A protein has these predicted regions:
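Short, aromatic/basic amphipathic alpha-helical patches
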Residues: 74-84, 241-242
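Glycine- and other small-residue-rich loops at beta-strand/loop junctions that grip anionic moieties
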Residues: 15, 45, 133-134, 159-160, ...
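Active-site/ligand-binding-proximal alpha/beta "capping" segment
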Residues: 204-258
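RNA substrate-binding interface of SAM-dependent RNA methyltransferases
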Residues: 51, 87, 115-116, 120-211
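A glycine-rich helix N-cap at a beta->alpha junction
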Residues: 82-100, 184-187
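Structured adenosyl-cofactor binding patch, chiefly the S-adenosyl-L-methionine
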Residues: 107-109, 147-151, 165-178, 240-279
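Boundary-proximal intrinsically disordered activation/regulatory segments immediately upstream
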Residues: 1-75, 162-163
Length: 279
């Protein structure tokens, strides 16, 4: 018997059959229509990798099952006591047959979605908020969450056309921060921007327009205020109606004929400038 079979309070169950129904919540993670993290299907939240699983355990999303190799179980042994969920231990080959691809990170956790707060709730007490419109790429979305966590952004607000922050790829790219940084979805867009303004936020809209204020100028002017950084989709950027509702249009000075940066990179620069000023 391995000492990993008797971690206090952890229900370790060995699984050798990839068709075992206990593993159904991890099945076909790459399929278009059967993947368990589709909001229209099971709507599960899937954490992938030791660090992301650890962040799920620290979040409001409570896993109901974990699947991983013996090696990853060993790495998580100090995190799992008290977790009321079985750990299905399997070989890497069995895991690959279940999920549909070879999983280098060696461990998954599945949790059910929980009710989401409203915009007013997540911005209450916040100094810096990221507001996203049309950010429909999961990797960009995940990167923005990681940047937000690392650079002191208090919350994220989703406008229209954004990808699902709880999609497995978004959670993975965010390194689990999509599970920890508070977020809310606007129910009336872009009218909900007025809610932010009524709560004292200065709305800074990122745009490549040469007529906009520079990022350094805009952030310095708003140093003592609550700030909402508005970023739009790759390519089209923020919609005209959203730009009209902003307080200041903000650009990042560019060179060599480059008109703009990737949305996650642009957001990171804005977050950094805000943090650099100690706001």
């Amino acid at each position: 018997m391995s000492d990993l079979d008797c971690i206090d309070g952890v229900d370790v169950q060995d699984v050798g059959d990839p068709d075992d129904p206990r593993l159904d919540d991890f099945r076909d993670l790459n399929s278009v229509d059967r993947r368990p993290d589709l909001p229209t299907g099971k709507g599960l939240v899937i954490a992938e990798g030791v660090l992301v699983v650890q962040r799920m355990l620290a979040s409001r999303f409570t896993p109901h099952a974990l699947l991983g190799t013996d090696r990853r179980l060993a790495e998580l042994r100090d995190d799992l006591p008290g977790v009321a969920a079985p750990f299905y231990r399997a070989s890497a080959d069995v895991m690959a047959q279940v999920v549909g691809f070879h999983l280098n990170r060696g461990v998954l956790a599945a949790a059910r979605r929980v009710p989401e707060p409203g915009v007013a709730q997540v911005v209450d007490g916040a100094r810096t908020v990221a507001v996203l419109e049309g950010v429909n790429d999961h990797e960009n979305l995940g990167s923005i969450f990681r940047n937000a966590a690392g650079l002191g952004v208090d919350a994220v607000v989703f406008g229209s056309g954004c990808a699902d922050p709880l999609y497995r790829r978004a959670v993975r790219v965010s390194m689990g921060h999509a599970l920890l940084v508070p977020y809310a979805r606007a129910t009336s867009w872009p009218a909900d921007l007025m809610l932010l303004r009524e709560n004292g936020f200065r709305l800074l809209a990122m745009t490549p327009s040469s007529e906009a204020s520079t990022l350094a100028e805009a952030m310095a002017a708003a140093r003592d205020e609550r700030v909402a950084v508005l970023v739009g989709a790759e390519g089209p950027g923020l919609k005209s109606a959203t730009l009209r509702l902003s307080d200041v249009r903000v650009r990042i000075p560019m060179s060599r004929g480059t008109d703009s940066l990737n949305v996650a990179t642009a957001a990171a620069l804005a977050f950094y400038e805000r943090a650099r000023l100690g706001s």
